[in-house]
Amino acid sequence: MNLLEKTRKINSMLQASAGKPVNFKEMADTLGDIIDSNVYILSRKGKLLGISIHQQIENERMKKMFEERQFPEEYTHSLFTISETSSNLDIHNEHTAFPVENKDLFQNALTTIVPIVGGGERLGTLILARLSSQFEDDDLILAEYGATVVGMEILREKSEEIEEEARSKAVVQMAINSLSYSELEAIEHIFEELDGNEGLLVASKIADRVGITRSVIVNALRKLESAGVIESRSLGMKGTYIKVLNDKFLNALAEIKMK
């Protein structure tokens, strides 16, 4: 494959994933295939978002790192000193992606570090590693293009997370606003009683203690359930099982109590 064909392969991957959840493993595999190297896609905090192994590295520490999908904190921080592509770093370089405790086995091993940048901020790092043979200009062009594509996908994922969080908060706010004063008071007492995201409660006991009717509690729970904020299930004499579905709800309730 020439450079153009390899670039088209990255484009095909991007087009195929349009509108789907981000698959960083697939991205790593594609880059690994066309560059012929091990590929590690790291987040800002060193989380291994995607990995593709083309050349096996027999080392227990590395295996554990891959299983836990987390690079060491110190190493991750050191990557932020690299602001542009650094190619063909040998085993003696602090940024090598090979186990330094086995230097003798990796005398010809080379690492290339490519910062992943998007929206004016550092989003992560693309690391390429080969047991031998240098990364040439074509490899670096593909790596930088790949890092740009990964950066776009990370930004898109972050944008979707922000939108989802905003939707969750809006749903909670609408659900709370739909409650009457006595229903809101009942809900506050219910979740004081639960002391967590889920649990059992006996509505009649809460009604007697707080001085409200049982129907107020039932109506309040029904409104929250219809909004998708909680789920509830009657367990007969045992009471009612309640589980919070929207993780923004308890925080919103706590903020109301503080006012």
Curated annotation (Swiss-Prot):
Name of protein: Global transcriptional regulator CodY
GO MF terms held by the record: DNA binding; DNA-binding transcription factor activity; GTP binding
Chain spans, region GAF domain: 1-155
Major place of residence: cytoplasm
Presence of the UniProt keyword Lipid biosynthesis in the record: no
Annotated family: Belongs to the CodY family.
Residues the record lists as Phosphoserine modifications: 215
InterPro entries cross-referenced by the UniProt entry: CodY, GAF-like_dom_sf, GTP_trans_reg_CodY_C, Transc_reg_CodY_N, WH-like_DNA-bd_sf, WH_DNA-bd_sf
Intracellular or extracellular location(s): Cytoplasm
Alphabetical list of Gene3D superfamilies matching this protein: 3.30.450.40, Winged helix-like DNA-binding domain superfamily/Winged helix DNA-binding domain
A GO cellular component annotation in the UniProt record: cytoplasm
Protein's UniProt keywords contain Cell division: no
Disulfide bonds: none
Protein function: DNA-binding global transcriptional regulator which is involved in the adaptive response to starvation and acts by directly or indirectly controlling the expression of numerous genes in response to nutrient availability. During rapid exponential growth, CodY is highly active and represses genes whose products allow adaptation to nutrient depletion.
A Pfam family reported for this protein in Swiss-Prot or TrEMBL: HTH_CodY
Keywords recorded for this protein, A-Z: Cytoplasm, DNA-binding, Phosphoprotein, Repressor, Transcription, Transcription regulation
A biological process term (GO) from this entry: negative regulation of DNA-templated transcription
DNA-binding region: 203-222
Alphabetized SUPFAM superfamilies for the sequence: Winged helix' DNA-binding domain
